């Protein structure tokens, strides 16, 4: 069965084709980063309008590159939420209309489920069950994943998400948009011994996170020093070091509590090289295996949505619906699946 995946939850338009026998046939992605840069962040109305412009040309490009056609598609999987309501409506309405015209079903996919399952696009892939660290601009969660749709929250941020803290601290350092990625690049030039920032909730008796206070501590540190290129790099290093220390410690604790021996790291911050290095170093010599998505699948993309749709299609998922009607969920708890 061939599934067309469509992702429009924020500022990337992603489409992909996933075959239940052959795997991923192809995917195309358009990022709106350049458009939003002058505003210093995502403008929801502009994001929605750009999805409308991009989605059909991207699908045509996808079919050409994959040497297939719409007539071969058995179902469409689209992101139903969470995300920006207008952006979600663009993908959902397009998916529903296309499915109605072709008389094929639509699967509503949770955006975070797509991220959780994205390492399954790579080889080797994890087996169920596993612990997942889902870390992005909007979410920081530890989940126990026992199967498709079987997700249990172990811990989450009580305030800012890790990616959000990266972006906000990047603004304090006068970095351009997207700030989190630029902060990580700047941190590679920083010196480890110059500054140390707190590790919030590092030793708490739960698996929750907090990054708001760390951002405030970084702001106070920036205010105390005259900024030059080296000082900015040193502070970036200290900030990234603190965030990744917390993420690693909590992930290892989750593995110890659950007794599971597989860790999946997913979401945009999962591309962070220092986080990857620390996890691999900390877990080397143990029986625990860490799985990272390919870098192209860390950001929002259609491939993870097509994959999630294909897996649910194989299970004859109850959310399978006919084209012609649709709803979106700007807020949606992953445990409610």
From Swiss-Prot:
One of its GO terms (biological process) is tRNA threonylcarbamoyladenosine modification. InterPro entries: ATPase_NBD (IPR043129), Gcp-like_dom (IPR000905), KAE1/TsaD (IPR017861), TsaD (IPR022450). Keywords: Acyltransferase, Cytoplasm, Iron, Metal-binding, Transferase, tRNA processing. It catalyses: L-threonylcarbamoyladenylate + adenosine(37) in tRNA = N(6)-L-threonylcarbamoyladenosine(37) in tRNA + AMP + H(+). Fe cation binds at residues 111, 115, 300. It holds the Pfam family TsaD. Substrate binds at residues 134-138, 167, 180, 272. Binds 1 Fe(2+) ion per subunit. Its EC number is 2.3.1.234. It is an enzyme of class 2 (transferase). SUPFAM superfamilies: Actin-like ATPase domain. GO terms for molecular function: iron ion binding; N(6)-L-threonylcarbamoyladenine synthase activity. Its main location: cytoplasm. It is found in: Cytoplasm. One of its GO terms (cellular component) is cytoplasm. Its cofactor is Fe(2+). Belongs to the KAE1 / TsaD family. HAMAP family: TsaD (MF_01445). Required for the formation of a threonylcarbamoyl group on adenosine at position 37 (t(6)A37) in tRNAs that read codons beginning with adenine. Is involved in the transfer of the threonylcarbamoyl moiety of threonylcarbamoyl-AMP (TC-AMP) to the N6 group of A37, together with TsaE and TsaB. TsaD likely plays a direct catalytic role in this reaction. PANTHER family: TRNA N6-ADENOSINE THREONYLCARBAMOYLTRANSFERASE, TRNA N6-ADENOSINE THREONYLCARBAMOYLTRANSFERASE, MITOCHONDRIAL. This is tRNA N6-adenosine threonylcarbamoyltransferase.
């Amino acid at each position: 069965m061939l599934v067309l995946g469509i992702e429009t939850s924020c500022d990337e338009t992603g489409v992909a084709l996933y075959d239940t026998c052959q795997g991923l046939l192809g995917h195309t992605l358009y990022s709106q980063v350049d458009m939003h840069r002058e505003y210093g962040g995502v403008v929801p109305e502009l994001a929605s309008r750009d999805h409308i412009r991009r989605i059909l040309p991207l699908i045509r490009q996808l079919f050409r590159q994959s040497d297939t056609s719409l007539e071969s598609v058995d179902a469409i999987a689209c992101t139903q939420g969470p995300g920006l309501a207008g952006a979600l409506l663009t993908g959902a309405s397009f998916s529903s209309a296309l499915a109605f015209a072709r008389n094929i079903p639509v699967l509503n996919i949770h955006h975070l489920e797509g991220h959780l399952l994205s390492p399954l696009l790579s080889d080797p892939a994890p087996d169920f069950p596993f612990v997942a660290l889902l870390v992005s601009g909007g979410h920081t969660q530890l989940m126990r994943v026992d199967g498709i749709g079987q997700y249990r929250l172990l811990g989450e941020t009580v305030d800012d998400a890790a990616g959000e803290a990266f972006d906000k601290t990047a603004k304090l350092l006068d970095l351009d948009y997207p700030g989190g990625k630029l902060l990580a690049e700047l941190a590679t030039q920083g010196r480890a011994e110059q500054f140390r920032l707190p590790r919030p909730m590092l030793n708490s008796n739960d698996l929750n996170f907090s990054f708001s206070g760390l951002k405030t501590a970084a702001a106070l540190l920036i205010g105390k020093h005259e900024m030059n290129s080296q000082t900015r790099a040193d502070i970036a290093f200290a900030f990234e070091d603190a965030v990744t220390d917390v993420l690693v410690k909590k992930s290892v604790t989750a593995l110890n509590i659950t007794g599971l021996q597989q860790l999946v790291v997913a979401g945009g911050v999962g591309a962070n090289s220092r986080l990857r290095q620390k996890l691999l170093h900390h877990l080397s010599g143990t029986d625990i295996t860490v799985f990272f998505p390919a870098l192209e699948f860390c950001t929002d993309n259609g491939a993870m949505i097509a994959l999630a749709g294909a897996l649910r299609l194989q299970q004859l998922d109850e959310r399978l619906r006919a084209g012609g009607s649709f709803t979106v969920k700007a807020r949606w708890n992953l445990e409610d699946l």
